[in-house]
Amino acid sequence: MSSRMRVYSATDVGKKREINQDYVFTSDIPVGHLPNLFVVADGMGGHNAGEYASSHGVMTLVEEITGDVEYNPVKVIRHAVEKANTWIFGKASQEESYSGMGTTMVVATIIGGFLYVANIGDSRLYVIDREIRQVTRDHSLVQEMVRLGEINADEARSHPKKNIITRALGAEKTVDVDFFDLKLTEESVVLMCSDGLSNMVEDRKIEEIVHRDDISLEEKGRELVREANNNGGKDNIAIILIEPFSSEVD
């Protein structure tokens, strides 16, 4: 199936930040016992600490998955996420310059038409087929406020506390990971992104761009980044677009 899979990924510093703390990893060939692997991470911390947390967190995750003898995708990803959490937390605890650093992380693999997803923080995974669906649930203060009925989804988008997350990799000694799985269709497109995209571009606009049939997957990805920057580019932007069952011919 990987031979039919099309992938586009990008990060962009945005319009307001000097350092890019977002990090992406993509592989449409096996990583350990997983047939493919896709990761988006959005780091946080002063100076270069956020950049360090996201990049080294992802590298630790990939290293662990590469060496894991387990075949169950959920167990493989859980082991690797826990190892990455331990590594970031340890580094932040031992070195003052890295104190308080952490990262969001959304991890995905596609096996036999099924999508397996792990999530910590407010980076997102969407599936777009007939309509757009957010698969992950944000671990954020405003999402909790929405859940409790204190604000609605539109108010959450512009809320002054929208950047406060309630869960992050490396923030504590142990990490609670959410897992999701679903069956993909021939029409499914998977979008993974940091909040630099989802806070800047509304879901319906994302859906509109992904549904365009006059441009390539790469052009759709570039258009999403462009749209985020045109709307203010207030944060770093990271995206991965995946067509698991592409019927295009080179």
Spans of model-derived segments:
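PP2C/PPM-type serine/threonine phosphatase catalytic domain
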Residues: 1-250
